[in-house]
Amino acid sequence: MAGNKLLVYLLRRDLRATDNPILHHLATSDHGFTHLLPIYILPPHQIETSGFVVEGQKSPYPLAKSQVGRFWRCGPLRAKFQAECIWDVKKNFENIGSGMLIRIGKFDDVLKHLIKSLNEDHQSIDTVWMTEEPSKEELDDQTAVASVCSKEGIGFKLWHDEKYFIDDRDNGLKDPQDTPDVFTTYRKTQEPLRERPRPPLPRPQAGSLPSFPSWIPPQQAPFRIPDDYDEFERLLLEPVKAPIISDPPQFPEGAKSAHPFKGGETPAWDRLYHLIKSGAMTTYQETRNGLLGTEYSTKLSAFLAMGTITARSIHAELVKFEDGSEESYSRGFGFGKGENEGTRAVRFELLWRDYMRLCTFKFRTRLFKIDGFKGASGNYTKKWLTDREEDAEPDQNPTPAQVKDMIDRWIRGTTGMGLVDASQRELQLTGYTSNRARQNVASYLTKSLGIDWRLGAEYYEQSLIDYDTHSNWGNWQYQASCGNDPRSRSFNQVKQAFDYDQDGRFTRTWVNEVKSIDRLEHVFQICTCPKQELEKHGLSDNIMVTNPLKRIDFSVTKPRGNRRPYRWRKQGDRGRGGRGGRGGGTGNTSGNGDNRHNEPSPPNGGNRHNDFSPANGGSYMQGQPISGGYQQMAWRGNSHGLPSGRGYNSRQYMLDYSQQQQQPQHQLQHYYAHQQHQHPHPRQQQQQFYHQIPPHI
């Protein structure tokens, strides 16, 4: 390769050919590079790679386990999705005349080995490019690569990350520290959202990129990279496929994954086209709090997290649909009629993703600290329950061993809280659970049980197919009230189930034990079921009945006079405004540890541009039935996740007791919805979306 100029492109969460600034630059400018070597590195601290070790040898890296709970950093379902993303972009690069290597190791180790191998063959690297990322571990990787390049006299450049909705260079923030601490404040500075994104960049034409090198150094020992996808996936999943708990849930008969999609750039675009053509984007605002099926939300969050599609590409296709300029979208409901509530809601949530990332830029390693963003003020005093003896308060009650059992049951989905258990089983078996369910699961762990929120964030990191560092950790802080939520709040999971699992289908689908239980209040909290029915279904000795982790008082109660009908309400609630939820129990100290929980050193070298699916985000919403869907409205919640902060006084929650006694359960739920329609809350006249908590889409 004498006389040639080799550019090494290190990919991370930019696994796409379309709207890729680096590829676009190489395809359209006079850059002088003769060869391009794209490399995707599997980082052993973030994903377990011991399956690739040659037989008889040992991995030089420790297990890829989380710091607090010792969960896998990447579980089998996300590992499979990630493998599909890697292999798909590899094929796409090949289709435009390039290619992509897959390597294992720390970024600087891989680069050093590549330089050494090339030098031994009298070859060299001219420049290394990569796209910037703001998280601590990613910053460390950037710093390490920049250091190697500086020592070896190799050029290095960090490219601006352009996979987000509004480009950082256009959001008006001169410095990340200027990011408002409240999302609404930031949102107001960016509207109207439809006018803000930059246009996406086209896919490079075949043959427009520098040549792929003909000679490539092998993978450094002791690892090997197979040439076919099936073997690659098998080796990646082998170390992490065993269940992390005893007696894990089995896949229920008749249940289906809400996220059956393969990973990759190609499936991402297929999904986007389907959403627009089917009209699902138009109805998104009405359906986004759904629990079952593939169509209630976009399911684009996993693709966005891996960078297989960009937010501005999604926006650009929505504009074509709204303007009526793309004929292939003409059968989609709302075609050519401008922005609608659904497409506006999608943009709103894409902006949330931008904001969560900006918060990472601003707060850095506070994203992972137990006192969260609010700890920056120095006034955070909350103590959390922990299962770690070394971190627990001397008088912690329950004990660390008891907390460990509570966490195991939370993971297994045997807490006794139907909505929570259904979500946890769905997550463990499919790698996905809905936005609304994530909020309730997080609130239950942090507010009802008072357990260290980082354990929840780490478990979601392991389990979620659509895991995104900024959204996941930021959302868990939000639910734990140590993030950028201006108010402390908590959910009543029984009421939430009545609101969003109105016929009990979701809970019954994933929790086999309650499949044949008739009354919804017993489905949603099995310990309230009468003894005779428990005996009938063989549930008398079930741990969810005999020892629920946290019983939540919620029942049908009789009013004091004849002026009001019977209604669903939390026992003890007098209809006054909530003051915000509080997590119970004493607990551990900060336990900051090391690794990504500590501040990184700044990058030394290179051109750095200065520029947070559940995760468990979403909104406190109460629905109003409309023709063709369940119209969701955005509200600020009080301590029970209710609109308006006024307890249960709103007539939209009331039930006629006589009709309850006379009607079957499914008719009762229809009547419940009808009451909401007849008595809409006055604040439903306000604009939508504006008070949501962090979402995934």
UniProtKB/Swiss-Prot annotation:
SUPFAM superfamilies: Cryptochrome/photolyase FAD-binding domain, Cryptochrome/photolyase, N-terminal domain. Residues 659-675, 683-697 have a biased composition (Low complexity). Gene3D superfamilies: 1.25.40.80, DNA Cyclobutane Dipyrimidine Photolyase, subunit A, domain 3, HUPs. The keyword Lipid metabolism does not apply. Residues 188-198 have a biased composition (Basic and acidic residues). It holds the Pfam family DNA_photolyase. Its cofactor is FAD; (6R)-5,10-methylene-5,6,7,8-tetrahydrofolate. Keywords: Chromophore, FAD, Flavoprotein. Residues 5-164 form the Photolyase/cryptochrome alpha/beta domain. The keyword Transport does not apply. InterPro entries: Cry_DASH, Crypto/Photolyase_FAD-like_sf, Crypto/Photolyase_N_sf, Cryptochr/Photolyase_FAD-bd, Cryptochrome/DNA_photolyase_1, DNA_photolyase_N, Rossmann-like_a/b/a_fold. PROSITE patterns: PHR_CRY_ALPHA_BETA. GO terms for biological process: photoreactive repair. GO terms for molecular function: damaged DNA binding; deoxyribodipyrimidine photo-lyase activity; FAD binding. Residues 578-590 have a biased composition (Gly residues). Residues 170-215, 554-697 are annotated as: Disordered. Residues 560-569 have a biased composition (Basic residues). Binds 1 FAD per subunit. Binds 1 5,10-methenyltetrahydrofolate (MTHF) per subunit. May have a photoreceptor function. Belongs to the DNA photolyase class-1 family. PANTHER family: CRYPTOCHROME, CRYPTOCHROME DASH. This is Putative cryptochrome DASH. It comes from Gibberella zeae (strain ATCC MYA-4620 / CBS 123657 / FGSC 9075 / NRRL 31084 / PH-1). The lineage of its organism: Eukaryota, Fungi, Dikarya, Ascomycota, Pezizomycotina.
